[in-house]
Amino acid sequence: LEIAGFLNLVVGGRLSYEGKMMVNSMLTIVTEIESIGDCCYNLARTLQRKQDSHIDFNDEIVSNIDAMFKLDSEALSNMVALLSSNEPLMSEIMISYNKECEINNYRNQLRGANVENINNKHYEYQSGIYYMDMISECERLGDYVINVVDAIKQQQVKHA
C-alpha cells in the first residue's frame, strides 16, 4: 500500500508520457504482487478450514496439489527473474506464458477428474471441495503472475 501510494504521488507530478506509463506499469506490478500474496493467504485459510473440519486428503490429492504448487513455484521464480532483469528477453517472457498454459491445463485436467473421483467414491465429497478450492486458488495465483509478466512486457515494448 505504501509503495502504491508513493507511485500515485509520483504520477501526479511532472512526468513525461513515457514516465507516466512506466509508473502505471509499476502500479500494476505492485497490485498484482499484492494479489499473489492474497492467494497465498487464501491457500492457508483453505488448509486451516480443512484441518478444522477434520478432512483428510488421500495420497493422490496430495500429489496433485504438490504438482500444482511446483508449477506455481516455477511461474513465480520466472516472474522474479524477469523483475530482476534490466532487459528481459522475449524468450524469457514466453516461458511465463507457457507455464500459465501448463497451470490452466493441469487445473482443467484435475477438475474433470475430481467429479469422476467423487462419483466413484475415490474420496469424499468434502475432500474434493477443499481440493478444488486449493487448485483454483493456485490457478488464480498463476493468473496474477502472468499479469505481472504482461506489465513487464509492456515496459519492454515502450522502451524498444
List the model feature ranges, each with a label.
Residues 1-160:
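Cytosolic, long alpha-helical scaffolding segments
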